[in-house]
């Protein structure tokens, strides 16, 4: 995802920096960064997707991909860069969205940066039925053009002003926000770069 690389370059995230991806899916960004020598831990809810990431890396980096439930699991440590591409919009309930932001705040180093990308054009709002969230479904992997089992998603799209409010209510400071159009598989997305308040 270009925004991940742009943020790494702009904020001078180095190969020695500790990087955390929230919601790695099929591993596109984490695998790319690992291949470039970055120190990445990629967390993903779907065990099938985690196993696919390990397979795609020929199990060279098995400890860099971990099945993880952001709503329940705990993780030690702080990270210099945390990024999440197209994940926050899957959390529909306000308390889940708050847990997501609190998780970032808890694990971001005092000088660290976080990149949060959400579906949406910055203006429209939408909320789906949460009863079908996280059921496993089959889809074609964009990396290998084969069928894989992944977690289906729910969707909550918010306007930029409403996202700014919820991010800042978690003691995070938004230092950049914009609409981007270069996230693979999405039309327009809201992009936020944050740091601890």
PLM regions and their residue ranges:
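Conserved acidic residues
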Residues: 80
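A short glycine-rich, Lys/Arg-flanked "PGG" loop and its adjoining helix->strand segment in the class I
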Residues: 98-110
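A conserved beta-strand element that flanks and buttresses the S-adenosyl-L-methionine
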Residues: 83
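Class I (Rossmann-like) S-adenosyl-L-methionine-dependent methyltransferase catalytic domain
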Residues: 1-15, 20-63, 67-74, 113-197
